[in-house]
């Protein structure tokens, strides 16, 4: 019988990390929101800790944190 896959590790992006990633990319809230495809209100709620990014948004933020220049280039902002 095949072994079960381990449960995925829940990794969440802290509100301070969202803001730090945006600063690293040198983007305003408005520009960053457009760049990642969310509303400014959503981005503000992430940065204020009222909500947390999940799914693709969280993955994009993690990638942007590790490779900001690549993300800017891919998203046409470099």
Model-derived features with residue positions:
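N-terminal flexible/basic segments that precede or flank functional cores
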Residues: 1-13, 69-78
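Short basic helix-loop element that most often maps to the first helix and adjoining turn
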Residues: 18-31
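Short, basic-rich loop-to-helix N-cap that marks the start of a DNA-contacting helix
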Residues: 50-62
């Amino acid at each position: 019988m095949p072994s079960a896959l381990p449960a995925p590790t829940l990794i969440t992006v802290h509100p301070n990390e969202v803001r730090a990633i945006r600063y690293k990319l040198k983007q305003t809230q408005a520009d960053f929101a457009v760049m990642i495809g969310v509303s400014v209100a959503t981005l503000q709620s992430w940065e204020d800790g009222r909500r947390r990014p999940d799914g693709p948004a969280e993955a994009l933020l993690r990638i942007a944190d590790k490779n900001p220049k690549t993300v800017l280039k891919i998203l046409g902002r470099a």
